[in-house]
Amino acid sequence: MDQLERRIEDLEMKLAFQEGTIEELDQQVIKLNDLMAAQQQQLRILITKLQSVEPSNMANQSEESPPPHY
């Protein structure tokens, strides 16, 4: 019976450790999800700002005349 009790205790300890690990991982997932949501919001703001910027008056590089040679 001693061996059975030890095996049960070992399983209980492993289960407790796994529960703690799962809780830690769950908290990390929550933090990463919050971070991702914040980054998505920042990206949406940046896209909106970029879309509202007027195009530059500079010509495209392909439209530019070649520089004078020295």
Swiss-Prot record:
InterPro entries per UniProt: SlyX
Coiled coil, from the record: none
Pfam families: SlyX
Family that this chain belongs to: Belongs to the SlyX family.
Protein name as it appears in the record: Protein SlyX homolog
Source organism (scientific name): Shewanella sediminis (strain HAW-EB3)
